[in-house]
Amino acid sequence: MNNNYIPLNIDLLKDFLDEGLLESNIEIFVSQSTGSTNDDAKNFLSEQSSLLSIHASEQQIAGKGRNGKKWISPKGKNIYLSIGWLSNLKYSQLDGLSLAVGTILASSLNKFTQNQVGIKWPNDLLIEKKKISGIL
């Protein structure tokens, strides 16, 4: 890890969230290591404790991409984060959501980086042709 490394913590995440969102029914979790933030979000929402949850970790030991592909997740090297959202919508009504989320994320990240964040259809964000995110 480099000298500029800042460990994840809940307060750090809250600094980047909209105040209105923080006042809503949202739960935020940060861990040093987890199997998969996506699994954490699914498990949490199955308990229906909150309509919205954020799960972040310094490391994933069983991260997955599309079609069950392994997602390499070394400690402190990337942002491992899943957002869980409890919805009554059918999957067919969510068509295009990953592209919309990708567009918003790319636009937001471009404010913080000198390198252009791009979108690779259907669900990846890239910087300099290297994948930085997958949206599931």
Question: What does each of the following model-derived ranges do?
Answer:
Residues 1-111, 133:
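N-terminal lobe of the biotin/lipoate ligase/transferase fold
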Residues 101, 107-136:
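Acidic (Asp/Glu) carboxylate-rich active-site/surface patches
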